[in-house]
């Protein structure tokens, strides 16, 4: 998935303190708006609880205060990926091959920006998704947002 330059810089700054605490940095989202939000997704083999999120928030806040990469006021949110886990990297798609995914594309493919189907494969920077009986291939750089579809 194509990250903005700011998101790339933030990922570089945030990954070290998150990993030093023993967590996996799943990904980040920076949402601009009236009140901008920096959302950090973390995970671990044992799962994530509120204390884990607080620890990461404290460490990341310290780094952000020193480095100051965001020039506007923002809220910091730290959470687990949840059931509708967002996906950010080719490794995420490969890990969840066979699972259902919902995609929002940056640029339409076949006049559609929203797609949902089963992840079939990942090759380099391309993902193949089975959609309504057809295999559709998407460039990761064209995926604006991707989430697993939970089944209950």
Curated annotation (Swiss-Prot):
Keywords: Cytoplasm, Ribosome biogenesis. It comes from the Bacteria. Coiled coil: none annotated. Disulfide bonds: none annotated. It is found in: Cytoplasm. SUPFAM superfamilies: YhbC-like, C-terminal domain, YhbC-like, N-terminal domain. One of its GO terms (biological process) is ribosomal small subunit assembly. InterPro entries: Ribosome_maturation_RimP, RimP_C, RimP_C_sf, RimP_N, RimP_N_sf. It holds the Pfam family RimP_N. GO terms for cellular component: cytosol. Belongs to the RimP family. Required for maturation of 30S ribosomal subunits. This is Ribosome maturation factor RimP. It comes from Erwinia tasmaniensis (strain DSM 17950 / CFBP 7177 / CIP 109463 / NCPPB 4357 / Et1/99). The gene is rimP.
């Amino acid at each position: 998935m194509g990250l903005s330059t700011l998101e790339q810089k933030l990922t570089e700054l945030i990954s070290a303190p998150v990993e030093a605490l023993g967590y996996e940095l799943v990904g980040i989202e920076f949402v601009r708006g009236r009140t901008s939000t920096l959302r950090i997704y973390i995970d671990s083999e044992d799962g994530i609880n509120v204390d884990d999120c607080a620890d990461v928030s404290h460490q990341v806040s310290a780094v952000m205060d020193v480095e100051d990469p965001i020039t506007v006021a923002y809220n910091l949110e730290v959470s687990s990926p949840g059931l509708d886990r967002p996906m950010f990297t080719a490794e995420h798609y490969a890990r969840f091959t066979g699972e259902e995914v919902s995609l929002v594309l940056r640029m339409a493919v076949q006049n559609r920006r929203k797609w949902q189907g089963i992840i079939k494969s990942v090759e380099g920077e391309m993902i193949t998704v089975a959609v309504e009986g057809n295999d559709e291939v998407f460039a990761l750089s064209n995926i604006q947002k991707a989430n697993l579809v939970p089944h209950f």
